[in-house]
UniProtKB/Swiss-Prot annotation:
Keywords: Repressor, Ribonucleoprotein, Ribosomal protein, RNA-binding, rRNA-binding, Translation regulation, tRNA-binding. The keyword Repeat does not apply. The keyword RNA-binding applies. HAMAP family: Ribosomal_uL1_B. This is Large ribosomal subunit protein uL1.
Length: 235
C-alpha cells in the first residue's frame, strides 16, 4: 500500500476513529485544509443501489444555496440566433456544427456542455468523447434545453449535475474551504435533500450507507448522515 505523506499522516492523526456530527465534521475538514490554495470541499456518499439496473440509477442536479466557489466554463451547441444568445448569457463557447467538429477532435476547453434539442442528433455522435468525461447533455440534468440563458445562469450560480458511479457512490464538490462552516453545512444539507428526493424507484434496503467529507488535499471525515437528515434547513 502507498504510504501517506508526513503532512497527510499528521493531519489524519487529528481525526478520531468515529462518526462526527455534520457541523463538527465540516469544521474539522476546514481546519485540516492547510494547502497553499483554497481547497475544494467534497462529499462522498455511498448509497445502497446497483446502477447496472436502470431503476437504481441516480443522475440529477442540485442548486447549492451558497454556490461552489468555482468558475464553470460552459460550452453550448446550438444554431442560428441561439448562438449569440448563449454568448450573451455568459457561455465561454457557443456554436453549431463547427463546435461539434472541434469537440470531436478532443478539444474540450469547458466544464459543462449544454445543447438545444435540435442539435442533439449531432451531439449524440460524440458519445465516445463526451461519455467518459460525463459531459453528454441530458434533459434530466437540465443540459438539453431551449432556455439557454436560464440554464447558463443557474449553472454559473452553483447548480451542479451529479450521478452515482458504477459502485453506487456519489462524488460532489460542495464549496471551498474558505466558506464558513455554516455555509458549507447549508450546501451539504441541500445535497442530502436532493439525493433523498431523487431516490431511485428500484432502491432496496438501506438507501444511505455512509457519508464522508474531505478537502482536495486533506483526510476524510465520516459524517453522521442521520443527524444531517434530521437538520431542518434554516436552523
Amino acid at each position: 500500500m502507498p504510504k501517506l505523506s508526513k503532512r497527510l499522516a499528521g493531519l489524519a492523526s487529528k481525526i478520531e476513529d468515529r462518526v462526527y456530527e455534520p457541523l463538527e465534521a465540516i469544521a474539522l475538514v476546514k481546519d485540516n485544509a492547510t494547502a497553499k490554495f483554497d481547497e475544494t470541499m467534497e462529499a462522498h456518499v455511498r448509497l445502497g443501489i446497483d446502477p447496472k439496473y436502470t431503476d437504481q440509477q441516480l443522475r440529477t442536479t442540485v442548486a447549492l444555496p451558497n454556490g461552489t466557489g468555482q468558475t464553470v466554463r460552459i460550452a453550448v451547441v446550438t444554431r442560428g440566433e441561439k448562438v449569440a444568445e448563449a454568448k450573451a448569457a455568459g457561455a465561454e463557447l457557443a456554436g453549431d456544427e463547427d463546435l461539434v467538429e472541434t469537440i470531436a477532435k478532443g478539444e474540450m476547453e469547458f466544464d459543462l456542455l449544454i445543447a438545444t434539442p435540435d442539435m442533439m442528433p449531432k451531439v449524440a455522435k460524440l458519445g465516445r468523447v463526451l461519455g467518459p468525461r460525463g459531459l453528454m447533455p441530458n434533459p434530466k440534468a437540465g443540459t438539453v434545453t431551449i432556455d439557454l440563458a436560464g440554464a447558463i445562469q443557474e449553472f454559473k450560480a452553483g447548480k451542479l449535475e451529479f450521478r452515482a458511479d458504477r459502485t453506487g457512490i456519489v462524488h460532489v464538490r460542495f464549496g471551498k474551504a474558505s466558506f464558513t462552516a455554516e455555509a458549507l453545512l447549508q450546501n451539504l444539507k441541500t445535497l442530502q435533500e436532493t439525493i433523498d428526493r431523487n431516490k431511485p424507484s428500484g432502491a432496496k434496503g438501506r438507501y444511505w450507507k455512509s457519508l464522508y467529507v474531505t478537502s482536495t488535499m486533506g483526510p476524510s471525515v465520516e459524517v453522521d448522515f442521520s443527524a444531517l437528515q434530521d437538520i431542518e434547513q434554516g436552523s
